[in-house]
Amino acid sequence: MKKGLIALAAVGMLCVSALGADAPKAPAQKPKTAAKAASQPTLPKPTMEDVHYGPHPKQVMNFWKAESDKPTPLLFFIHGGGWMGGNRTSGLGGLLQEMLKNKISVVSVEYRFIPEATADGEVPPVRGPLHDAARALQFVRAHAAEWNIDKQRIGASGGSAGACTSLWLDFHPDLADPNSKDPIARESTRLWCAAVSAPQTTLDPQQMKEWTPNSRYGGHAFGFKGDKEKKLSQFDEFLAKRDTILPWIAEYSPYALVTSDDPPVYMIFSSPPALGKDQKDPTHTANFGVKLQEKCKAEGVPCELVYPGAPDVKHPTVSSYLIDKLKAEKP
């Protein structure tokens, strides 16, 4: 029980740090004291650092190789931050240590944020960070033999926007192009599983509003900026123009992509759900988890949902789920 409470507290901290575009900029903070700095997890040095999987300066990853004489499973970590901030070490901390201790290698990826994707001509902008993650996954698989990785047993994880990206990978049809001249593009983008913290499970503003009336997140993913003169918020514009972007929602919203052949998923939230009611943190509400779990159950996709007071909790933490799934005996 204590372990579960600690895990939920960690999810809460992750949500605060991963608000990204949803939150106003905080005032400049004073430098951390030595005591606070000492409390931050110290990450082991990567086996390989700043490995480029693409030409953009942000298309890089770190790789930590688990000690093993046979190919290891892999945690594919995607940091949060609203696709607007954060870096490849954000939120990785204790999860990295747990994986390495259990002979699971780890990759953590950097990717283009919404402004960078927009500058590169990605339409809609969210295509940039999502397809960067897919390309990074293919890159890892292309180097599986060299890095001693079991290319089948790859589980994705992350918080907030990184969690949304992980679920998108989990549910999206394979992006592999078997006829490509590029050997990396021939690799699969399918996962073994995904275990995420506080994900946004839909990018459909109408669903968000129905599930959580005070929703306000997601418009930036599709290039909406609102209009201050008209007192039109980013989300208001997103909702008003929803019908013009239905094909984008169908392609980039995790909820819309769920089908019966998808890998299993796990979600953890720091507060219990309250469907149809305003939430203190509508961007990271467990309402997202409840509705995705309903969809997964209807499609026959295994889906575990954890929050304070949740019934039938099998795995109290992301790490416990990943270790169980990635290290399970082959049938």
Q: Can you annotate each of these PLM segments?
A:
Residues N87-R88, L95, V107-K151, D312-V313:
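Catalytic nucleophile-loop/oxyanion-hole region of alpha/beta-hydrolase
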Residues Q40-K45, H56, L175, P205-L257, ...:
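Mobile cap/lid helix-loop segments that gate and shape the active-site cleft of serine hydrolases
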Residues D69-T72, G80-T118, C164, A176-D177, ...:
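Short substrate-entry loop that stabilizes the transition state in hydrolases
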Residues F77-G80, S108, F139, M267:
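Structural cue for short, hydrophobic secondary-structure segments
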Residues Q29-D69, T259:
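N-terminal cap/lid segment of alpha/beta-hydrolase-fold proteins
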Residues N62-W64, V265-K280, H284-P331:
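C-terminal catalytic histidine-bearing segment of alpha/beta-hydrolase fold enzymes
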Residues S180-P213, T244-Q279:
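The feature captures the conserved acid-bearing segment of alpha/beta-hydrolase catalytic domains
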Residues R135-P213:
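Primarily recognizes the serine-hydrolase "nucleophile elbow" in alpha/beta-hydrolase
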